[in-house]
Amino acid sequence: MPTKQQSRKSRGRGSTKKKAASPRQKTGRPAEDRALREHLLYLLGGGGAHLDFAKAIAGLPAELRGAEPAGLPFSAWRLLEHMRIAQWDILEFSVNPRHVSPAWPDGYWPESDAPPSDRAWEKSVKEFRRDLKRMQDLVANPRTDLYARIPHGEGQTILREALLAADHNAYHLGQLVLMRRLLGAWRN
């Protein structure tokens, strides 16, 4: 069984052979630091070319949450749960040295195409939003050194993990919109 660190390498988390550096000293450039944090928060919140999570899931009929359009290997439920699990993993890795990631790739996807209940769907939505808010709070906190290597990582930084979360969410939210279009459940 691969170790947590080996598992991270196989998922493209990025690794370096260098030892973790001590936390980066303040640059004395608060305006640039503030601008970077604002940009990251904008991306995490669905700004720019990114899609807002709430808009992507709004109005999706319950009966279509488990539907897979022809030619696509996923349903809205699979995408939602995958995004929730991956975002939770990224966040927990960022803040918890004892965190153990799920097994790759099976641990990042639900077993079924459809949510077992409306309650399961709502719980997943709530947890996704909660963890997104936690990532945003981490980035917004001026005491968070965005550039320092995460001590229990392999060269990752909070900056990198925040960008990873924003990019991963944007990618799969785009898939969700495509799936909804193919099902006739997306408004233009």
PLM regions: where:
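Short, contiguous alpha-helical
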Residues: K17, P23-K26, P30-H50, A54-I57, ...
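Low-complexity, intrinsically disordered/propeptide-like segments
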Residues: R8-K9, L43, E63, M135, ...
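Acidic/histidine-rich alpha-helical segments that form the ligand environment
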Residues: E111-R149, R160-A165
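Polybasic, lysine-enriched low-complexity intrinsically disordered terminal tails
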Residues: M1-K26
